[in-house]
Amino acid sequence: MKHLLSIADLDRESAVELLDEAERFEQALLGREVRKLPTLRGRTVMTVFFENSTRTRVSFEVAGKWMSADVINVSASSSSVSKGESLRDTAMTLRAAGADALIVRHPASGAAHQIAKWTGAADDGGPAVINAGDGTHEHPTQALLDALTLRQRLGDIEGKRIAIVGDILHSRVARSNALLLSMLGAEVVLVAPPTLLPVGAHTWPVTVSHSLDAELPGLDAVLMLRVQAERMNGGFFPSQREYSINYGLSEKRLAMLADHAVVLHPGPMLRGMEIASAVADSSKTAVLQQVTNGVHMRMAVLFRLLVGSEDGAL
């Protein structure tokens, strides 16, 4: 695997191997006074973010540093992009500067794929490119860390019924999760108002529902999504209050879930809209576990791309 641009870059076997690898990194760090492994010593990892981020950016930085990589942050606002430099010139500059990996977030769908083409194949001296979110397209490492969290909470993903709820239309997280979770054997249901479902949702390996209340009792897990108002130009629902009434995860709705069920959210959470504050802080909700798993999962991805599965121990 040269890049991780989409869940389509993985098959079931390689996805499970990444989940297992992430757990091995977690175990390798346990009990260490200094959380450092020599795995990526001498490698240069660059995070290139053209959109704001807390969880994804920080976890990639921590992952790289815990593996002894040299991590360099490139912010669009402080780079030559702000002076009008093209994305291609920026990407080629970072390659020439010695990047072994480029971790890219960009508001345009397909940006990471394009950067991978421009900078060349990883086995021909070009950097490995990791898609950290491209527009409304995909966010593969988020789906992987969500799958890891579900596996830890539920024991297995095979045969589980998992709902993805909310703004599916604008969500790269929904797309990647739908593909990965179904690949791992889950039954995935999208729950959203018709206006927040993409036109091609019927082609995804999912079922579709417009009623959250009808789905909750039969779920093993629910992934709540933020309404991405920054990507909306029109009225997709009458009001925030009505949206919350119909699709928000309230304490009453939380009680409708099975005892073993788990609640996920990729963040940032809009407390009081898609998720009640009490629900966000409940023991059923695995938001902070997702963040922790995000570091280990991204360590596994960096290891797989820059070292490979056969080149030695952690």
Curated annotation (Swiss-Prot):
Disulfide bonds: none annotated. GO terms for biological process: 'de novo' pyrimidine nucleobase biosynthetic process; 'de novo' UMP biosynthetic process; amino acid metabolic process. It is an enzyme of class 2 (transferase). Its EC number is 2.1.3.2. InterPro entries: Asp/Orn_carbamoyltranf_P-bd, Asp/Orn_carbamoylTrfase, Asp/Orn_carbamoylTrfase_sf, Asp_carbamoyltransf, Asp_carbamoyltransf_Asp/Orn-bd. It catalyses: carbamoyl phosphate + L-aspartate = N-carbamoyl-L-aspartate + phosphate + H(+). GO terms for molecular function: amino acid binding; aspartate carbamoyltransferase activity. Pfam families: OTCace, OTCace_N. Pathway: Pyrimidine metabolism; UMP biosynthesis via de novo pathway; (S)-dihydroorotate from bicarbonate: step 2/3. Keywords: Pyrimidine biosynthesis, Transferase. One of its GO terms (cellular component) is cytosol. L-aspartate binds at K83, R172, R226. Carbamoyl phosphate binds at R55, T56, R105, H139, Q142, G267, P268. Heterododecamer (2C3:3R2) of six catalytic PyrB chains organized as two trimers (C3), and six regulatory PyrI chains organized as three dimers (R2). PANTHER family: ASPARTATE CARBAMOYLTRANSFERASE, ORNITHINE CARBAMOYLTRANSFERASE, MITOCHONDRIAL. Catalyzes the condensation of carbamoyl phosphate and aspartate to form carbamoyl aspartate and inorganic phosphate, the committed step in the de novo pyrimidine nucleotide biosynthesis pathway. Belongs to the aspartate/ornithine carbamoyltransferase superfamily. ATCase family. This is Aspartate carbamoyltransferase catalytic subunit. It comes from Rhodococcus erythropolis (strain PR4 / NBRC 100887). The lineage of its organism: Bacteria, Bacillati, Actinomycetota, Actinomycetes, Mycobacteriales.
